């Protein structure tokens, strides 16, 4: 890879061709290595330490395959394979582009140090002198279909942002031409789509697997993934106008920051300094290595950015133009990023330097970020008015006055902040929807559909989160088979308790029925004991509808034969998933359409 970096950086066509061949060879070797490691899992070859620590002969076959990326060594190897594959794609599709060699030289530079990290701190091919009879099994929390696909999606998001970073670096050397911008938008869109999908999958998994009944806990590892996502969101928006030399340097800075935040996240998670329900592997030596990589990439990329500041000089957007609103949007996103960054890292700093354990709870994040989310929604609304103002100033001013009057009435009424927020978001949702329908009816232009749906889905998502926060409720009860309890207009009944044996765990299966009016739902919740290690996990029972979910977690058994049960009624969950999916699809459609597919 070091040779490939040198060949690409030489900008000599003969050497570039040789570098491309080395890149393909590197990808082939990595693919064989990954296939070989997967084969060891499928063969229960516990002579390999990595296989021993993450599998067993009782583990179902499909989880033996996903166990390959379940821990640090395999997951990083997969990420390296994906980065190498992206370099091959760059060679294949953009061979004639003047920026391709610099882009692949940057990616080769990154890949070289990733390989060093893999070899010296995270080698998954180490073996025992004597092969054990069985492994210690895969972490039970990872024995889940959704968690089998979540890590590869997350790593793909990180890797794709490394590619956008390499394109940004290439632009600083070779100039940001039309074709480079086109490909930057494509890679940035796919990167954002992939990372957003990973966050959504993680939220769904947390909701049904971890048992607290929530989809986002402001857990440190959740926050670490959110940091590059926020920067990536700002970066994607900044690409809209930067081709016109507006906010060009801002776009470059955001592209660099997004990549650096993904590296920083890897350092924090792998260093072992976080306590998190999502942390499954840690090693301080890995953290030191990754911190060194972060420092190397940060100093080199930011140093290049400042050295090219004259070439990146761009125009400042006009006051109250769409570009100006876009800049405000970016600033709000970065303020949110700063809040999450400080709330996540401050406890780490106090523990490292002052030996004091400090915990920052969800209230800190919610209280500071919620007003900023409302600000973002207000900017969505302002953009709609700004577009109309240019077309028909008089009617638009009347509409602004009417909407402002409604907002004023809402604010002077005696409503709680959460209810006020709900009404505000609902009103914005109605206005955006009406605006979208009018535009589509008049223009019949489906090309704007992805933008409309994107903003609508964000507002709908905010509305669903507020509904969930305001109206969801739960209760802890003790029930024996046949007992029932009334809660919030619903009747919960424990129908039966049975013990069943599975391939690699024994489970207590509790069957419930929940009735409301004439409707009855049947739910199953489990308490599993895994045969290797004796780890106990709870499997939630969930019945979903568009309005609300019934959520049941089976707890411990008491001496009198009764069981502790947490029964929750969660509102708006399905709306959260639906709005997130709409957001993803709108981004995917826009990305593909812009690239001409």
Short names for language-model regions:
Residues 152, 159-169, 180-237, 259-263, ...:
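Extended, hydrophobic alpha-helical segments in both membrane/secreted and soluble proteins
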Residues 13-30, 89-111, 173-193, 241-256, ...:
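Membrane-interfacial loop-to-helix junctions in multi-pass inner-membrane proteins
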Residues 30-52, 66-87, 117-126, 226, ...:
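Transmembrane-helix bundle segments that line or gate the permeation/cavity pathway
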Residues 107-120, 160, 191-200, 258-266, ...:
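Alpha-helical transmembrane segments of multi-pass integral membrane proteins
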Residues 3, 75-76, 82-112, 116-128, ...:
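A conserved hydrophobic secondary-structure block that centers on an alpha-helix together
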Residues 15-16, 39-73, 123-151, 201-224, ...:
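Membrane-interface interhelical loops and short amphipathic "cap" helices
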Residues 1-14, 18, 25-32, 36, ...:
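Contiguous transmembrane helix-bundle modules in multi-pass membrane proteins
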Residues 459-596:
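Accessory, solvent-exposed terminal regions and/or long lumenal/extracellular loops of proteins
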């Amino acid at each position: 890879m070091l040779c490939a970096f040198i060949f690409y950086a030489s900008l000599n066509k003969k050497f570039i061709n040789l570098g491309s061949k080395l890149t393909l060879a590197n990808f082939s070797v990595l693919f064989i290595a990954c296939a070989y490691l997967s084969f060891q899992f499928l063969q229960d070859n516990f002579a390999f330490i990595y296989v021993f620590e993450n599998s067993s002969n009782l583990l179902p076959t499909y989880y033996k395959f996903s166990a390959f990326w379940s821990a640090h060594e395999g997951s990083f190897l997969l990420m390296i394979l994906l980065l190498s594959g992206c370099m091959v794609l760059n060679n294949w599709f953009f061979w004639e582009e003047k920026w391709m060699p610099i882009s692949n030289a940057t990616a080769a530079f990154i890949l070289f140090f990733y390989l060093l990290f893999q070899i010296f701190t995270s080698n998954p091919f180490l073996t025992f002198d004597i092969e054990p009879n069985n492994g210690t099994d895969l972490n039970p929390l990872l024995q889940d279909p959704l968690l089998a696909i979540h890590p590869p999606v997350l790593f793909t998001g990180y890797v794709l942002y490394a590619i956008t970073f390499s394109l940004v670096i290439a632009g600083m050397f070779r100039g940001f031409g039309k074709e480079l911008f086109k490909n930057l938008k494509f890679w940035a869109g796919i990167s954002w789509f992939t990372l957003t999908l990973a966050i959504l999958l993680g939220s769904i998994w947390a909701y049904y697997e971890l048992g607290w009944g929530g989809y986002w806990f402001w857990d440190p590892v959740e926050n670490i993934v959110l940091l590059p996502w926020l920067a990536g969101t700002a970066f994607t928006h900044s690409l809209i106008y930067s081709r016109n030399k507006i906010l060009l340097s801002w776009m470059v800075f955001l592209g660099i920051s997004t990549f650096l935040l993904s590296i920083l996240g890897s350092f924090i998670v792998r260093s072992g300094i976080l306590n998190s329900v999502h942390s499954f592997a840690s090693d301080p030596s890995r953290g030191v290595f990754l911190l060194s990589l972060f420092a190397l990439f940060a100093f080199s990329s930011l140093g290049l950015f400042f050295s090219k500041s004259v070439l990146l000089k761009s125009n400042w957007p006009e006051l109250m133009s769409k570009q100006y609103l876009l800049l405000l949007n970016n600033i709000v996103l970065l303020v949110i990023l700063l809040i999450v960054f400080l709330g996540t890292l401050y406890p780490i700093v106090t523990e490292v330097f002052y030996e004091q354990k400090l915990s920052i709870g969800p209230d800190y994040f919610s209280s500071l970020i919620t007003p900023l989310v409302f600000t973002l929604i207000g900017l969505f609304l302002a953009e709609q008015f700004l577009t109309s103002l240019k077309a028909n100033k008089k009617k638009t001013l009347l509409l602004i006055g009417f909407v402002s009057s409604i907002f004023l009435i809402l604010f002077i009424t005696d409503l709680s902040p959460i209810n006020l927020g709900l009404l505000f978001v609902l009103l914005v949702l109605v206005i955006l929807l009406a605006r979208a329908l009018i535009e589509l009816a008049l223009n019949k232009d489906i090309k704007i559909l992805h933008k409309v749906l994107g903003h609508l889905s964000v507002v709908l998502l905010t509305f669903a989160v507020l509904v969930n926060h305001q109206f969801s409720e739960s209760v802890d009860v003790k029930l024996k088979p046949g007992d029932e309890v009334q809660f919030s207009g619903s009747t919960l009944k424990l129908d039966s308790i049975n013990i069943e044996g599975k391939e690699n765990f024994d489970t207590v299966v509790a069957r419930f029925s929940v009735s409301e009016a004439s409707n009855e739902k049947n739910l199953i919740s489990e308490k599993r004991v895994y045969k290797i290690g004796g780890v106990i996990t709870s499997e939630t029972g969930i019945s979903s509808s568009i309005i609300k979910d019934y959520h049941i977690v089976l707890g411990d058994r008491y001496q009198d034969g009764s069981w502790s049960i947490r029964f929750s009624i969660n509102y708006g969950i399905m709306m959260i998933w639906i709005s997130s999916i709409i957001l993803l699809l709108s981004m995917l459609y826009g990305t593909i359409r812009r690239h001409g597919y």
